[in-house]
Amino acid sequence: MLDKKFHIKKGDTVSVVTGKDKSKTGTVLRILPKRDGVLVEGLNIVKRHTRARGNEPGGIVEKEAPLHVSNVMLYCGKCEKPVRAKKAILEDGKKVRVCVKCGEAFDK
C-alpha cells in the first residue's frame, strides 16, 4: 500500500478554489488520508440530524465536512492569495515548503 503525500498539513492556512466556499480561507483542522480529504475550520458547513444519546441532546448540529485535497490550495500571507508550494533546503539542512511566487517559508 502506498503512502499518500499531501501538500497540506494540519494547522496550515488554506484557500478553497472550487465549490460553495470558493475563495474563502481557513485553518486545516484534520487530514483524512483514506478519503483524500481535509477538514477546514468554518468551511463546508453541513447540518447533521443527531439522535439523543445519554447526556447528549438530539437535534440539528452544524459541523465541518471534508473537502477534497485537490479543492484547496495553501494561502500565502505575504502574497495574500492561494499559491503553490515547493520544497527547499535551508542552510541548516532542514527541508521546508516555500511559496513559489515570493519564497516565504510555510514551515517554521
From Swiss-Prot:
The record's keywords, sorted A to Z, are: Ribonucleoprotein, Ribosomal protein, RNA-binding, rRNA-binding
Q: Which GO terms describe its molecular function?
A: rRNA binding; structural constituent of ribosome
Please give the Pfam families that the UniProt record associates with this protein. KOW, ribosomal_L24
Keyword Protease included in the entry's annotation? no
* GO terms under cellular component: cytosolic large ribosomal subunit
Please cite one Gene Ontology biological process associated with this protein.
translation
Question: Is rRNA-binding a UniProt keyword of this protein?
Answer: yes
Q: Which residues form the signal peptide?
A: none
The record ties this protein, via InterPro entries, to: KOW, Rib_uL2_dom2, Ribosomal_uL24, Ribosomal_uL24_KOW, Translation_prot_SH3-like_sf
Q: What family is it from?
A: Belongs to the universal ribosomal protein uL24 family.
Quaternary structure (record): Part of the 50S ribosomal subunit.
Q: What does this protein do?
A: One of two assembly initiator proteins, it binds directly to the 5'-end of the 23S rRNA, where it nucleates assembly of the 50S subunit.
List the protein's name: Large ribosomal subunit protein uL24
